[in-house]
């Protein structure tokens, strides 16, 4: 069986920033039931598939039969969207228990959640909402991540958000906040490059400068996705993290630069609505694989020269 943990860690010759470069990292896509038969017929060799945990919290039925069929052939990544890691209230223990049970049942190679909140006072929101970056929020987030990691008995990967508003009360930058969370909890980072580009465009900061501020040595997975364009009330460009189209050229550029810096890393193509035919989604994954393969060759040459 394939295993996304089968990577070779190699210290980059002459590297002074402590970043570890990795070879032979797999590329995967979101798993959608509409694609099941096509995947089983012509899937992704040495790839993996990611599922949203909340779609599988029932005991059985068609969702689990489909997921079991995929799990027989491929590793899976379990991606939570409703844990409300960033909320000020206590975690929903029933939800956490179901999340833990999925980890036990399917043994995913990667487990992740969002730096966001989606519930408060018994009310649940169908969105991933931003949070103020303060010391008080940092304490809540670290406590929640530690609670999740204790439950699943493994490190969690935390995904950077896409945002459309910022809080005036924030006393830390987003990258400072994420770095502190990683330092205090030992969690890893799921680096969503489309989120970086969306937020950078919406708030007017440099995506490259943002990446410089992150603990890149802790990146355990990369997400790539498409976004849509809208106009706000002042007719300014507003990007929406819509996951309903192909990956944009600027995001591919960020990906190529990131892989050149940290080495090939497990990469997931997200496409959640306006689903294309499987060959279209598969082609996006193969494009990412081509970039990582180029870096594999570069890394092998560096290791050979270093020897």
From Swiss-Prot:
Please give the family membership noted in the entry.
Belongs to the UPF0276 family.
PANTHER family (alphabetical): UPF0276 PROTEIN HI_1600 (PTHR42194:SF1)
Tell me which HAMAP family the record gives.
UPF0276 (MF_00697)
Q: What is this protein called?
A: UPF0276 protein Bphyt_5128
Organism annotation: Paraburkholderia phytofirmans (strain DSM 17436 / LMG 22146 / PsJN) (Burkholderia phytofirmans)
